[in-house]
């Protein structure tokens, strides 16, 4: 049975794991790393790069290198803040109002949804996992922030489908971390999972023990993460440079990309050192010449710059503990998740809020993927006696008279869940009702996130308040909502599976899947072309070396013929003309037998006449060490296959 891939699709980095021998195992990517940057780039030649390859060229190609796209997934353009738009690439409004990304692909402007960008990262993880395991991967469990709304969950599921994965389950990141932490725990524990990643913050309180994982409450902030710490450092660097030089770098994408990389390095370094020297030579220039940035950022200064960000984790944690029905003193373990939790100030804040020293036994970068793999094992039947009881993070409501949001399912309700309520008409002889659904905690409908709407018509004429309309909300195990409305008088029913107002339609998902499949073929073809070029290059090198070694021992006409063929093949290689390379390689290989025969004949002739020039003389017998004759030089071994 093929394995289910557990994927932590992160804002900054992604990680994948599978169950092997009853244990979760993190899989390395094709570069040998255990995490993959969630970055996609498009080059001038139209090539698509994903992961480390995309990250490496970001400084030279900032406008076409997309990072942190998870912060856009399932969101409307109108919901974005100015801070969200402070990226070198272009964010545009799609016809349906979603936030999309516009880049230059081989000289042509193309627009992608965040789901499509995410699918490119997922497709790389899938391909790397298949290569590592030697089997086809078709199914996955993908994690999302606990505080993701319905639209964001649907968008993540769509990204998996585009990548060619059947998404067996969408699981909350803190819940996945708790699974990995507590799989072998027998005694009951109350644990708090404090998850601060690249783009989102989650806090969950769970009761675990003897295979039961019950989420008591979840809270968080989907717009708070490591990117915000980076931005605080970036803004400080830009401000300091402006004070010194009078120049504003905020509208120079190339400079911003370099500053972003340096800001990220500074943030990481300051988790283990007290100060970091920021050095960015030739960052820009004016009439007086080139300008450089040379600054020192201390840990206390970083903590001062980001104090307000860290403080934003306080309320969700306290609210979550209160909603769980526990007190701070009832928390037995504090599990830290996400790269940002390596920062001493973050650890101290988590410790203060939860009243516990952080648990040190989990890797914050890998624990979520391991939990996703365990959930995959549960779904496949490889992991037994595990019961996972998660909750819906936000209240789900319908609009009633006066624009009120009337709750159908309260936040922190255990899922899956199904709830029904009976409503009526607001006017006499009303022939239809509009069912509008939202997600959020505000009292007025318009202040919450609109998820979708549909119409139930054909209601029999009757005075206001007489018709009975039963509305049912059904949340599945993925946390995705299905809504139905039924006229109890006529039996007429209307249903909607909320795709989220920021989701892709089925047709759009299918189109994106076809594009992804075509790109997979394209990638395969490109890899084959590169292999052909490398083989030809290696062949030229090998033949040239043999010609040189043989010297004048070869017939002149054969030597000239082969030299001509090598020259033609090298020209084709330099032009990357694959058709010409294949023909030239075939042509050259057809004459190699003649070359080998001539070489053999020359060697036999040389053997009869004594050693060939450059050949080692036969060793004389000796009873002990001899003094070396001539010069002794360092030897180099050349591997013809490389």
Curated annotation (Swiss-Prot):
UniProt feature, compositional bias: Basic and acidic residues: 623-634
Expression induction or repression: By stress conditions e.g. heat shock.
Gene3D superfamilies the UniProt entry points to: 1.20.1270.10, 3.30.420.40, Actin, Chain A, domain 4, Substrate Binding Domain Of DNAk, Chain A, domain 1
Region (Disordered): 600-642
InterPro entries: ATPase_NBD, Chaperone_DnaK, Heat_shock_70_CS, HSP70_C_sf, HSP70_peptide-bd_sf, Hsp_70_fam
GO molecular-function terms, A-Z: ATP binding; ATP-dependent protein folding chaperone; unfolded protein binding
Keyword annotations: ATP-binding, Chaperone, Nucleotide-binding, Phosphoprotein, Stress response
Bias (Low complexity) ranges: 600-616
Keyword Aminoacyl-tRNA synthetase: no
Modified residues (Phosphothreonine): 200
Main function: Acts as a chaperone.
UniProt family annotation: Belongs to the heat shock protein 70 family.
Protein name: Chaperone protein DnaK
Organism: Akkermansia muciniphila (strain ATCC BAA-835 / DSM 22959 / JCM 33894 / BCRC 81048 / CCUG 64013 / CIP 107961 / Muc)
């Amino acid at each position: 049975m093929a394995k289910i891939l557990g994927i932590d699709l992160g804002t900054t980095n992604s990680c994948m794991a599978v169950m092997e021998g009853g244990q979760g195992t993190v899989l390395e990517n094709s570069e040998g790393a255990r995490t993959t940057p969630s970055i996609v780039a498009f080059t001038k030649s139209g090539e698509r790069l994903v992961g480390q390859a995309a990250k490496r060229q970001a400084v030279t190609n900032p406008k076409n290198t997309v990072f942190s796209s998870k912060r856009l997934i399932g969101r409307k353009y109108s919901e974005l803040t100015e801070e969200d738009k402070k990226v070198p690439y272009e964010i545009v409004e799609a016809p349906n109002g979603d936030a999309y990304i516009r880049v230059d692909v081989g000289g042509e402007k193309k627009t992608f949804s965040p789901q499509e960008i995410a699918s490119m990262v997922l497709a790389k993880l899938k391909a790397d996992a298949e290569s590592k395991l030697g089997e086809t991967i078709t199914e996955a469990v993908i994690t999302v922030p606990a505080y993701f709304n319905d639209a964001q969950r649907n968008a993540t599921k769509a990204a998996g489908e585009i990548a060619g994965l059947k998404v067996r389950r969408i699981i909350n990141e803190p819940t996945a971390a708790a699974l990995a932490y507590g799989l072998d725990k027998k005694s009951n524990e109350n644990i708090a999972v404090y998850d601060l990643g690249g783009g989102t913050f989650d806090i969950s309180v769970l009761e675990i023990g003897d295979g039961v994982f019950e989420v008591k409450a979840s809270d968080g902030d989907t717009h708070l993460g490591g990117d915000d710490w980076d931005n605080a450092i970036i803004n400080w660097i830009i401000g300091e440079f402006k004070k010194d030089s009078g120049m504003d770098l905020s509208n120079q994408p190339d400079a911003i990309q370099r500053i972003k990389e340096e800001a990220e390095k500074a943030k990481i370094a300051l988790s283990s050192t007290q100060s970091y020297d920021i050095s960015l030579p030739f960052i820009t220039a004016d009439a007086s010449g080139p300008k450089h940035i040379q600054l020192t950022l201390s840990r206390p200064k970083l903590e001062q710059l980001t104090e307000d960000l860290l403080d934003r984790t306080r309320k969700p944690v306290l609210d979550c503990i209160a909603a769980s029905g526990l007190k701070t003193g009832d928390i037995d373990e504090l599990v830290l998740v996400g790269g940002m939790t390596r920062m001493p100030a973050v650890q101290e804040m988590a410790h203060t809020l939860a009243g516990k020293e952080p648990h040190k036994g989990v890797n914050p970068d890998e624990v979520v993927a391991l939990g996703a793999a365990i959930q995959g094992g549960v779904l496949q039947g490889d992991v037994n006696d595990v019961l996972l009881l998660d909750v819906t993070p936000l209240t789900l409501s319908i609009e009633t008279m006066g624009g009120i949001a009337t709750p159908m399912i309260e936040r922190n309700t255990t899922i899956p869940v199904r709830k029904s309520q009976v409503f009526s008409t607001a006017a006499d002889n009303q022939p239809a009702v509009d069912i509008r659904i939202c997600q959020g905690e505000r009292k007025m409908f318009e202040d919450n996130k609109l998820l979708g709407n549909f119409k139930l018509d054909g209601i029999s004429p009757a005075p206001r308040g007489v018709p009975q309309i039963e509305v049912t909300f059904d949340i599945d195990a993925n946390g995705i909502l299905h809504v139905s409305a039924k006229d109890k008088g006529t039996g007429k029913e209307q249903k909607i599976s909320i795709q989220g107002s920021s989701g892709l339609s089925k047709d759009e998902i299918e189109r994106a899947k076809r594009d992804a499949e075509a790109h997979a073929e394209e990638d395969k073809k490109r890899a084959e072309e590169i292999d052909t070029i490398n083989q030809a290059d290696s062949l030229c090198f090998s033949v040239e070396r043999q010609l040189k070694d043989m010297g004048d021992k070869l017939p002149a006409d054969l030597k000239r013929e082969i030299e001509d063929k090598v020259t033609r093949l090298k020209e084709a290689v330099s032009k990357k003309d694959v058709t010409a390379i294949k023909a030239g390689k075939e042509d050259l290989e057809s004459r190699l037998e003649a070359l080998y025969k001539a070489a053999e004949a020359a060697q036999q002739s040389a053997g009869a006449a004594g050693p060939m020039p450059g050949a080692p003389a036969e060793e004389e017998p000796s009873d002990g060490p001899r003094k070396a004759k001539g010069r002794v030089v360092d030897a180099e071994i050349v591997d013809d296959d490389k």
